[in-house]
């Protein structure tokens, strides 16, 4: 059975005008939200860069040794994004409006990034639960009612022009 890396090898040469956006593309774009983009100048109000440039900057900033030491379940995200950045399908996607907030006292974890694709569509990717304790506490709190990240997700989408909302933004 194939995986998303196989998809990148199989369909990465095709632009969105040659093969329309699909569910696997959506899954791949979500990986961008799991990469630590701190220090890459793509925060809200900062630069807009291509995925190709973002990947280049990331691997200049982070050594292979540092990445190899990462044992989290999201450790492959930078490598998947690197493969995406080398493909015709994603390399020219514009990355912007990165936000990353973690506040243990508020039991808050919120991270989002905007990707503008070559077909003119805007995609807003949110980081879900990763392997830090704040994220897991927030997951448990979801069962009790609204969590701060839900409000932040709604504000993020309103600020950056999304017309539809994700699960995280639903009341």
Which residue ranges define each predicted feature?
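Conserved small/polar residues in nucleotide/adenosyl-binding loops
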Residues: 166-171
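Non-catalytic, mobile gating and regulatory segments of ester bond hydrolases
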Residues: 1-165
């Amino acid at each position: 059975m194939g995986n998303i890396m196989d998809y990148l090898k199989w369909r990465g040469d095709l632009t969105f005008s040659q093969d329309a956006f699909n569910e696997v593309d959506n899954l791949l774009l979500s990986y961008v939200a799991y990469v630590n983009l701190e220090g890459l100048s793509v925060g809200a109000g900062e630069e807009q860069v291509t995925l190709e440039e973002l990947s280049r900057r990331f691997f200049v900033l982070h050594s292979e040794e540092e990445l190899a030491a990462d044992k989290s379940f999201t450790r492959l995200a930078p490598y998947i994004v690197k493969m995406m950045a080398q493909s015709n399908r994603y390399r020219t996607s514009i990355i912007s409006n990165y936000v990353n907030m973690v506040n243990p006292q508020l039991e808050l974890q919120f991270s989002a990034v905007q990707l503008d694709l070559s077909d003119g569509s805007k995609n807003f990717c949110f980081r879900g639960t990763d392997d830090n304790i704040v994220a897991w506490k927030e997951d448990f709190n979801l069962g009790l009612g609204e969590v701060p990240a839900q409000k932040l997700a709604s504000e993020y989408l309103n600020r950056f022009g999304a017309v539809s909302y994700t699960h995280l933004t639903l009341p």
